[in-house]
Amino acid sequence: MTTLEIWLLAISLAMDCFTVSITSGIIMRRICWRTFFIMAFFFGLFQAVMPLIGWFAASRFSHLIEDYDHWIAFGLLAFWGGRMIKESFSNEDKRCFDPTKLKVVVTLAIATSIDALAIGISFAFVGINSFTSILSPIVIIGFTSFVISTLGSLIGVFCGKRFNLRMELWGGLVLIIIGVKILIEHLFLS
């Protein structure tokens, strides 16, 4: 793979992180750099580590992973999306979806990085055959996801302040749509 192809791949993998970060920023409605960097760190970390795991396990476990990875991603995103929709109709004191909580961030990071696991498996079949040859792609993927997630959070805060239209409802729908997209891609388009 060329460097340009790796950057384009990194940008495309970061789009789910970007969307989830926008959703989180919308819910927060204020700039909280610490939270944004923690979220971006975990998104970048999981986007970088998953291809490494996929690449490493490609020859041994690919048949086990590919049968249900999309269901895991869908389930996690649908769960958090459903909670957000439910919470959009409840009192603010009773809301559980909190993008500042580590459990929420890690769950979303795992869900949005399942595709990166599949990319790692494909790396094993396109001539990336040593740790030194996969190091550059995973660093680029992780860095890109970090930067794009941070930008998404900022965009979300801006949108959340300008539009006060049950943003948790819309954010929950976005998470469910991402989950459905992943499911459709794996069930019908692969």
Swiss-Prot record:
The chain crosses the membrane at residues 6-26, 36-56, 61-81, 108-128, 138-158, 169-189. It is a multi-pass membrane protein. It holds the Pfam family Mntp. The keyword Ion transport applies. GO terms for cellular component: plasma membrane. One of its GO terms (molecular function) is manganese ion transmembrane transporter activity. Keywords: Cell inner membrane, Cell membrane, Ion transport, Manganese, Membrane, Transmembrane, Transmembrane helix, Transport. It is found in: Cell inner membrane. Belongs to the MntP (TC 9.B.29) family. Probably functions as a manganese efflux pump. PANTHER family: MANGANESE EFFLUX PUMP MNTP-RELATED (PTHR35529:SF1). This is Putative manganese efflux pump MntP. It comes from Phocaeicola vulgatus (strain ATCC 8482 / DSM 1447 / JCM 5826 / CCUG 4940 / NBRC 14291 / NCTC 11154) (Bacteroides vulgatus). The gene is mntP.
